[in-house]
């Protein structure tokens, strides 16, 4: 499942498409497709005239099971599927896209952005061309820096994070 944010004002021409990857969330109900979850960055991009998609990652939203936290293949697939759905929705509503595709994400979304960018450029070049990508503050080194940080501070401020990491 995913969330689509249409531009917030009438367009004078074709629109760029941006895929916003959300940060780490511990609850299925906080996934972008769920009512009231809202993604501020999706709204910001839409207010500037972008068509916006925000993917739920597998295990979040309405999908069964646990989230495969920082599992690059499943994260990338979620983004590709959301992009396809967004393009299809635009086409069926007479919204023309201009061919520009932007990817961005923060926290887990940074990791997802890197995974999606790699997949788009290696497996989907006939379908998508990434214009620019901004993966921000992602957990890129789970086996090193992230684990070291979790274990070195006895007062780790996010105790909910460790079970997500172990379950993944």
Predicted segments with their positions:
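Gly/Ala-rich beta-loop-alpha elbow adjacent to hydrolase catalytic centers
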Residues: 105-109, 113
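Accessory cap/linker subdomain of secreted extracellular hydrolases
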Residues: 136-168
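Alpha/beta-hydrolase active-site loop
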Residues: 69-92
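A conserved short beta-strand
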Residues: 126-138
């Amino acid at each position: 499942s995913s969330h689509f944010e249409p531009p917030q004002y009438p367009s004078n021409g074709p629109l760029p498409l941006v895929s916003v990857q959300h940060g780490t969330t511990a609850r299925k109900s906080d996934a972008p497709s769920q009512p009231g979850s809202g993604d501020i960055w999706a709204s910001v991009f839409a207010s500037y005239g972008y068509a916006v998609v925000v993917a739920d990652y597998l295990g979040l939203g309405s999908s069964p099971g646990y989230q495969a936290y920082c599992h690059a293949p499943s994260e990338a697939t979620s983004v590709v599927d959301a992009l396809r759905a967004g393009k299809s929705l635009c086409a069926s509503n007479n919204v023309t896209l201009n061919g520009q595709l932007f990817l961005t994400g923060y926290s887990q979304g940074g990791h997802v952005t890197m995974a999606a960018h790699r997949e788009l450029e290696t497996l989907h070049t006939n379908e998508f061309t990434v214009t620019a990508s901004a993966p921000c503050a992602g957990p890129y080194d789970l086996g090193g820096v992230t684990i070291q940080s979790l274990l070195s501070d006895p007062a780790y401020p996010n105790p909910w994070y460790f079970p997500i990491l172990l379950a993944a």
